[in-house]
Amino acid sequence: MIRKLFYALMALAAMTTLGSCEEDDLEKVYDEATSLDAPFLFTEGYEDTIAIAYDLPAPITDWLSMVRDDAQVCKLSIPGTHDTMTGMGFYQPVLKYVFNMTAISQVSTLEEQMACGMRFFDIRPVVSIDTLATDPKEKQILRLAHGISELDVTFEEAIDQLQRYLKAHPSEFFIAKLQADNGMENQNNWTVLLDKVLSKPKYEGLFVSDWRPDITVGEMRGKILWLSRYDLRPLNALFHFPVVYCDWPDEDPDIDEALNPAAQRSCAMYNMNDTTVRATLYKQDYYKTTSELRMRNKQQTVVDMMHSAREATVTADPIWIVNHCSAYTEVSPRGYITNAANLHPLVIADLQQHDGTVGIMPMDMACHDYVHCIINGGTPYTSDYLYGFHPLSQSLTHLLIMSNKPYFK
C-alpha cells in the first residue's frame, strides 16, 4: 500500500512538473498523427547519416567472426548499452507515462542493439507479479526494470531474444551484467526466481559455465557470460549458478564528487563456484553529470580509463575493463542524451588519435548518430520532443569494433 501511494504521489508530481509547457511549445511536442495510446516511444524519425563508416569485411551483425579464436575476451574493445531494455517500453499502467519522461536511456530495442554491434548488455531483473498467471506458483516472475520502473519485458523473454540471435549468428557472444535494480529488501525470492529461469532446459549450453580471467573468444562463441554486481551467495546459500560476481562499488557524486582512480582500478571479478579464480577489474561508472564540474569529471575519468585500458590490454595480465560512457545531466531522456552528446565526441576523438583496445564501453542512446523522436508522456503537455541531438553513438560503436584489428584473423 505504501509503495502504491508513493507511485501515485510520484505520478502526480511528475505530471504537475511536466505539465508546465507553454502553449507555443505544443506544436513541436505533440502531433495528432502519433496516438497517445501508444505504449511507450514515438519514433518520429531518425537521420541516420553515420559520421564514421563501418568499413570492415564482415557485417556488423557478425563482427566477432573477424576475431581470432585465441584472442582473450578481456583484451578486446566491446561496445555495449547501459539500462539496455529501456527502449522496450514500461509495464505499469498510467505510471508508464511518468517513466517514459524520466527513465528512458535507450531509444532502440534489444534486437536493434544486437544487430548494431552491441555485445554487452545491462540486464536488471526484479521480482514482479504476472497478472495473467493462473497457477499461484507461477505468479511471481522476474521482470526487467530501471530503478522503480518495471519494463514491458520479462527476464526470460530477454534471454530468449539473446538466444535467438546467437543461434542465427553463432560467431558472436554476449556479456550481460545482472543486478536487482530497486534493492534487495523486497526481493526475497530474487535468487530463487533467477535460478528457476537460468536452469530451464531450453538454455542448456547457452551460458558460460567455466569462466577464467583469460577466457578466449573461441570458448565464448554462441554463449552468454553473466556478471553480477555483487556476490549472490549470501542472499541464497543454495545459489551456485555459474555467474561471475564483481566487487563493484558505487560511484555516486552526491556522496563523493571527487574522482578516485585508485579505487576504480582495484576492483575484482570472481568465479562464483571457485573464488580463487579471480581477475582484476578496472571499473568506471560515475553516473551523474548534473553540473559543469561533474561533466568535466566524467569526461576526464572516461578518457583516463581508456588510456589505462590500452596499457592493460597489451600486458600479459588478464585485466577486465568496464568503462561507462553512460550518465545523466537530469533524470529524463533528455538528461541521458545530453550527456551522450557531450561525451561521445571526446571518446571518438581519443579512439581516432590512439591505437589499442579499451575494454567494455556501455553507452546510452545507442545505434544512432542523430536522435529525433517523441517520448510519450500520456498527454500533449507531458510529451517530450527530443530533436537536434547528435550522440554519435553508432560512429562510436564502429570505432570500438575497428580498434580490435590487431586481434583479427
Question: In which residue ranges do the predicted regions lie?
Answer:
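N-terminal secretory signal peptides that target proteins for export/translocation
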Residues: 1-2
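Sec-dependent N-terminal signal peptides
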Residues: 5-13
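C-terminal motif of bacterial Sec signal peptides marking the signal peptidase cleavage site
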Residues: 16-20
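Long, acidic (Asp/Glu-rich), low-complexity accessory segments flanking structured domains
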Residues: 23-116, 129-168, 173, 234, ...
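Conserved, mostly hydrophobic/aromatic
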Residues: 124, 176, 226, 361
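Active-site groove signature of glycoside hydrolases
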Residues: 127, 170-185
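Acidic, His- and aromatic-enriched active-site or binding-groove loops in soluble protein domains
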Residues: 151, 155-158, 195-212
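Aromatic-lined glycan-binding groove of carbohydrate-active enzymes
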Residues: 222-334
